[in-house]
């Protein structure tokens, strides 16, 4: 049996997505590992999708959370990059094969054997990974990030998913090569508001695209967008046809792509980042007649993620957050489902994750040699 350390978090046990106190085990810190005491963890929209099994591949119990900032409390003997007491981060992935074409190009996020921070098997198949809604995590040092000085631990946490999710496609699809290009950001939520900030830091002229005008003043006056386009205003949409070089589509709900394609210039590029539950219709005619492109992007590799953190620290880019207690997570998930957050929930794990000593132990199961105990 693998050596284990006791750990505690909040887990979903079924498709209701309700999170409850949960005792489980982490592996012992190995020679290549870093043990992290978790201070803060962001709440990503994919956490909501996963705990409710919207994508059909959830395996319960699940402790979500892949926007983790904490303190290194142990380092393995082969680890030279980190030392005890360092402020570190853990993002969406915690393992890959390290030998495929993608890994050799620092694109571990596209490795066929990528290991996700939660709802996945460990690299050796002996245990199930659990995420950052918990007190501690043990991670291979190659998938641990250094949090730069000046980057806050709480509002910096969402950058480990939301930040790299918008930063990587901006680099790959050529949005950073020439300042003054026009970028449309469809949707002003957890991803969208970071896309505005990073886009402006890259010298782009940013237009927020939204269904309503409620966030217009905030987008322009506080987030720094250059303009705001309401998709229900037919006259403004007509005036904006062919004005944008790029569009980053952050919307996860079902929506039409044709109005967005019409906004692109010839050779324009639309990059989809949201993950709707159902496939979207792709209007081929608009692409062909305008030599336009549609692409996608999934987070980034470790090297690029570290680069993104340094970039955000330099430009003082953080997420706009609402700090919550662990006990507030279920109401936060309900609000997230209604897009009732500006713009990211972050759990104050260190100050609010408290075991309930009086709670009754209801279930205990053994999963590939790893004992998991659920408490409610």
From Swiss-Prot:
Subunit composition and interactions: Homodimer.
GO molecular-function terms, A-Z: cinnamyl-alcohol dehydrogenase activity; coniferyl-alcohol dehydrogenase activity; zinc ion binding
Gene3D superfamilies assigned: Medium-chain alcohol dehydrogenases, catalytic domain (3.90.180.10), NAD(P)-binding Rossmann-like Domain (3.40.50.720)
Cofactor(s) required, per the database record: Zn(2+)
Keyword NADP carried by entry: yes
Free-text remark on how the cofactor is bound: Binds 2 Zn(2+) ions per subunit.
Residues forming coiled coils: none
Originating species: Arabidopsis thaliana
Reaction catalyzed: (E)-cinnamyl alcohol + NADP(+) = (E)-cinnamaldehyde + NADPH + H(+); (E)-coniferol + NADP(+) = (E)-coniferaldehyde + NADPH + H(+); (E)-sinapyl alcohol + NADP(+) = (E)-sinapaldehyde + NADPH + H(+); (E)-4-coumaroyl alcohol + NADP(+) = (E)-4-coumaraldehyde + NADPH + H(+)
Function of the molecule: Involved in lignin biosynthesis. Catalyzes the final step specific for the production of lignin monomers. Catalyzes the NADPH-dependent reduction of coniferaldehyde, 5-hydroxyconiferaldehyde, sinapaldehyde, 4-coumaraldehyde and caffeyl aldehyde to their respective alcohols.
Tissue: Expressed at the base of the stems.
Binding, Zn(2+) 2: 97, 100, 103, 111
Enzyme class at the top of the EC tree: oxidoreductase
GO term, biological process aspect, one: lignin biosynthetic process
UniProt keyword annotations, A-Z: Lignin biosynthesis, Metal-binding, NADP, Oxidoreductase, Zinc
Name used for this protein in its record: Cinnamyl alcohol dehydrogenase 2
InterPro entries linked: ADH-like_C, ADH-like_N, ADH_Zn_CS, CAD-like, GroES-like_sf, NAD(P)-bd_dom_sf, PKS_ER
Family (UniProt): Belongs to the zinc-containing alcohol dehydrogenase family.
